[in-house]
């Protein structure tokens, strides 16, 4: 899976990508500007793009959908957005709407509530994929060598 996004949504995309990696699904975050300068070559047949944009209008992300389709016309897109009528949503194979929640910051602009919704949707995708692939604690422990999660997962395997 390849993840692309900008700004605060980009940080959410990075988190979702690393969570997929730790649960057995090879994933990478690709910054849209780097993709336009050759890194789009990471795309392979049967890859899936997950794009995140609250507005669904982020120029760099919309441009990337066209560039990626030029590279592989069969490439599938999932979009997480607060605007299911946006250009990005229209390009997607699957649109997952955040419901366009009002931002809780005093200005109503800083990504707060929207990024929380994006994170929740990403976590749901990870958990459902883990169920579908029947990802086990043994597989988890092989990917988590350090820290508390590594220690805990290894101890669960020993039982």
Identify the residue ranges that each predicted region occupies.
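Glycine-rich phosphate-binding loops that contact phosphosugars or nucleotide phosphates
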Residues: 6-133
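Internal, active-site/partner-interface "lid" segment
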Residues: 87-90, 104, 131-159
């Amino acid at each position: 899976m390849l993840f692309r996004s900008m700004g605060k949504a980009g940080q959410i995309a990075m988190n979702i990508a690393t969570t997929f990696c730790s649960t057995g699904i090879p994933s990478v975050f690709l910054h849209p500007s780097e993709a336009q300068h050759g890194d789009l070559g990471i795309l392979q047949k049967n890859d899936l793009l997950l794009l995140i944009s609250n507005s669904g209008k982020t120029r760099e992300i919309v441009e990337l959908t066209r560039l990626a389709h030029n590279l592989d016309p069969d490439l599938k897109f999932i979009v997480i957005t607060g605007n299911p009528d946006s250009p990005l949503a229209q390009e997607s194979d699957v649109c997952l709407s955040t419901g366009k929640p009002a931002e809780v910051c005093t200005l109503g602009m800083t990504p707060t509530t929207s990024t929380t919704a994006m994170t929740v949707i990403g976590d749901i995708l990870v958990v459902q994929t883990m169920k579908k692939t029947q990802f086990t604690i043994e597989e988890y422990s092989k990917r988590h060598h350090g820290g508390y999660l590594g220690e805990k997962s290894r101890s669960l395997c020993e039982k």
